[in-house]
Amino acid sequence: MAKEQQVQANDLQEKLIAVNRVAK
């Protein structure tokens, strides 16, 4: 379960980074 949560967190972080790039 811990690994799944870690993967989800990484996926969210990547999405946030992508959104930030688009915002800029």
UniProtKB/Swiss-Prot annotation:
GO molecular function, one term: rRNA binding
Keyword Repeat among record annotations: no
Keyword Signal: no
GO cellular component assignments: ribonucleoprotein complex; ribosome
Highest taxon listed in the record's lineage: Bacteria
Keyword tags: Ribonucleoprotein, Ribosomal protein, RNA-binding, rRNA-binding
Family (UniProt): Belongs to the universal ribosomal protein uS5 family.
Assembly with partners or alone: Part of the 30S ribosomal subunit. Contacts proteins S4 and S8.
Description of its domains: The N-terminal domain interacts with the head of the 30S subunit; the C-terminal domain interacts with the body and contacts protein S4. The interaction surface between S4 and S5 is involved in control of translational fidelity.
Function: With S4 and S12 plays an important role in translational accuracy.
The protein's name: Small ribosomal subunit protein uS5
Gene expressing this chain: rpsE
